[in-house]
């Protein structure tokens, strides 16, 4: 049985999606030109925090929450803005970005290096409270 590795899938995704560095993302966030979406598991947010004003959409729900035909669709998101996804290191967000491109989204990208690089860029990180 020949199975592709997860790294192979990430590498393939990265060849067909837009990848942004944290400095560019910081500029887009500062100018309110994007929706920054944290796709990490909620436990990661509780432990490490999240970028202030980012939206949390768990990776497992992303396609459903961004599908206008789905009962899970989040109408509150301004989908006219650039959508930028991030995870911890940039692998899950690469796969998720590829999925949104496959759905037909054009103005979507992900963060190279993920949450760690966003923190290093100076974007404000806030604590995510447990409900």
Describe each model-derived feature in a short phrase:
Residues 37:
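Active-site flanking residues adjacent to catalytic metal/cofactor-binding acidic residues
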Residues 86:
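Short, surface-exposed ligand- or partner-binding patches at beta-edge/loop junctions that are enriched
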């Amino acid at each position: 049985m020949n199975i592709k590795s997860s790294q192979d899938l990430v590498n393939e995704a990265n060849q067909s999606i837009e990848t942004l560095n944290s400095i560019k993302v910081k500029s887009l966030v500062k100018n309110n030109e994007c929706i920054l979406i944290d796709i990490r598991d909620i436990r990661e947010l509780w432990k490490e925090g999240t970028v202030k004003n980012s939206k949390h959409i768990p990776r497992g729900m992303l396609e459903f929450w961004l599908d206008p035909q789905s009962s899970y669709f989040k109408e509150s998101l301004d989908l006219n803005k650039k959508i930028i996804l991030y995870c911890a290191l940039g692998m899950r967000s690469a796969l998720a970005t590829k999925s949104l491109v496959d759905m037909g989204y054009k103005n979507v990208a992900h963060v190279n290096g993920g949450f760690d690089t966003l923190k290093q860029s100076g974007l404000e990180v806030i604590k995510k409270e447990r409900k």
